[in-house]
């Protein structure tokens, strides 16, 4: 009996540990690692998308989607999967091919997006935005400071994990964390890191430190860049990693 209880307890602990490492910590990566590939591209004049026949020119015909609904706050997650599915159909009927959202949505949005694209030969594409803390954006701090950059980088990485269906996020008003389990990465055209950057934040960052080195990362680098541009390159590079 004692061995049985120890075994059961060990299994429960392993399940909780695996759940934490996979959905919250992110260090448990079970998918096979191979060559990094990308189905989108760009040059100085055009955007490209690979829809099965190699990269071809792609014109984004986009719709901004917010999460408000009459009678509810946008943070309440009141929109149902059926409503999202109907909206996606109407958006595509308009002739649009891409949806932009400004921040991480409720799991229902990603579930509906997954179901819609799985059941349609012509999918919609998503541009995932990352929200910026409005309080910090209007505070007297540099974007290069840990106070600003670390929470923003965490939010960027959260967005990537959400898109790949491996994230739990603890939100106010929820007893338990909300879980994102649908991998929609094959329909994500790109990310927009940040919303409308405050001019004061940009100016303060550029003027706050004259000794900031140019950034040379694994995927992004800068040359003769201002401090704020260096910040954006560093955040983008670390998000890709």
Name what the model sees in each region.
Residues 57, 93-95, 185:
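Alpha-helix termination/capping residues and helix-transition junctions
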Residues 59-65, 97-101, 126-130, 191-193:
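Hydrophobic faces of well-ordered beta-strands that scaffold small-molecule active sites
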Residues 12-22:
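Hydrophobic alpha-helical membrane-insertion segments, chiefly the h-region
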Residues 68, 104, 196:
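Flexible loop residues that form catalytic
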Residues 81-109, 125-127:
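Catalytic domains of carbohydrate-active enzymes, especially glycoside hydrolases
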Residues 111, 119-241:
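Active-site region of glycoside hydrolase catalytic domains
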Residues 20-90:
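N-terminal carbohydrate-binding accessory modules
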Residues 1-13:
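N-terminal Sec-pathway targeting helices
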